[in-house]
Amino acid sequence: LKEPLDVIKLNPQNFEGSLMRMGGTFLGSNNKGNPFKKIIRNGKKIDSSDLVIEGFKKLEIDALIGIGGDGSLKILQSITKKGNINFVGIPKTIDNDVKHNELSIGYDTAVDVATNALDMLQPTAASHRRVMILEVMGRDAGHIALNAGIAGGADVILIPEIQYSIKSIADHIEKLRSKGRNHALIVVAEAVKKENGKKATVKYVDGEVRLGGIGNYLGDEIYKITDSETRVTVLGHVQRGAQPTHRDRLIASAFGVYAVDLIAKKKFNRVVVWKDRGVQDLMLSQVAGYSKTVQKNDPLIKVAEGLGTVSYTHLTLPTSRSV
């Protein structure tokens, strides 16, 4: 832990109009600094959670507002419980996979970016008679792919919660051809598995293994069957840095006001959520560590079926992995 403590003091100037228009986080925080995770340093294993708690106590802060997804909220639940720290959580993840929460900060913007990407890919797909594949983020939840796929007019939408076959995709492309279409748009979530059941992953130089590569796999397999020229676009971190949509700005503002009100009322260990067109709060234990994937009864699944984005009626949507 740095001494003196490395902090950013919040003041009215931090919250002038420009901040609302920015993507990312000016705090520079992420969920990779899990203090409970054993880190090997000079051959020793270290649990730095006590240092984090000590640093928090030194700052003499009355309460902590934690902003993040299910992973961040789980870490914060553990650290605040151990340190007896007053805590309120706010869901922020483009994956939109926080349990009991309809909309997380960042999600609407990510869907907008993916939709715009499909809008831009369609003309070049038509011009050059290609099958264009767009790989989007979302981890184990298919919310971005499903929503952007419908809004962007994708011909095939693939999400982790739904099993598929390369043959069904190839048949769909051939069907489009028979109707005079010379191109197709496919959107696929990064956690969609290969037909053998394995996830597509990429190993980085630092040894970290992350989701990625399913788009290229699909492109190769589709080409083998249909002889269609395929091109793959991996949208990646573009989804995380765009200018926030009006909906994200509204939700973030509403979450912030509600979280401060909870602290003023001394209601701690709560998470604010967006539900039934407004802000509510739930116990932290109801949310932290759980995920929200696309459900079998999601009305957008029916929309995707009706639009003919591969025949979902012949596929199996397994029971959600969420608790």
PLM region spans:
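A cross-family phosphate/adenosyl-ligand binding-site feature
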Residues: 1-60, 71, 191-199, 205-216, ...
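Active-site histidine-anchored catalytic micro-motif
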Residues: 1-132, 140, 156, 179
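Structural motif
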Residues: 24-26, 62-65, 85-91, 130-134, ...
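Accessory alpha-helical/coil subdomains and C-terminal extensions
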Residues: 55, 63-68, 74-78, 83, ...
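A short beta-alpha structural unit
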Residues: 237-244
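Flexible loop/turn connectors
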Residues: 251, 255-264
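Conserved small/polar residues in nucleotide/adenosyl-binding loops
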Residues: 313-319
